[in-house]
Amino acid sequence: MKVMLVNGSSHLHGTTMTALEEMIKVFHSEEVETEVVQLGGKPIADCLQCNVCQKTGKCVIKDDGVNEFVEKAKTADGFVFATPVYFAHPSGRLYDFLDRAFYSAGGYDAFKFKPGAAVAVARRGGTTAALDGINKYFGIAQMPVAGSTYWNMVHGLYGEEASQDEEGMQTMRNLARNLAWMMKCFAAG
């Protein structure tokens, strides 16, 4: 059982990663293997809309990890896509990554019927709009959406602030438990 967690932040160890680390603890306690994909530190190109991927199953842009992610996604059991909030939407980096990963995934077969969870981290507001943006990818790819005991969000400007958001951290733990449960149920048939 494996979940892939995508950190859509430019900061490898910022507030978004703080939220994911809280989830990872729960996944490990639930005996779910984790793999973190860090989008920070490298450029992510936007989709060229050339449609070559619809014939080849791969994006023509080969140097930013999207094709590698799609290959790994085919064997994953669930996904978490996490983002910092910029002006009430996910990071452009994450949007570019999702556009290309979902479109080039050959009819979305890498994601179909696999549960997904969106996570948004912000200093203050805009999280629900950001979550809506990510959840749209799940809907079009026929992915069940995992929820928690509150919206999947954490508040804080820096990692230590985010870790002090008790309700946000509890929401992340509950979200991880719910996603692990969904993956196990689907695997059991």
Positions of PLM-derived features:
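Glycine-rich phosphate/pyrophosphate-binding loop and the adjoining helix
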Residues: 4, 24, 28-30, 62-68, ...
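Helix-loop-strand module that forms the ligand-binding subsite of alpha/beta enzymes
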Residues: 58-150
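Cysteine-centered iron-sulfur cluster-binding motifs in ferredoxin-type domains/subunits
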Residues: 7-8, 12-17, 45-54, 77
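N-terminal beta-loop-helix "entrance" segment that forms/cooperates
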Residues: 39-58, 157-162
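N-terminal beta1-alpha1 ligand-phosphate binding loop
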Residues: 2-32
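A structural preference for short, hydrophobic beta-strand core positions in alpha/beta folds
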Residues: 35-38, 147
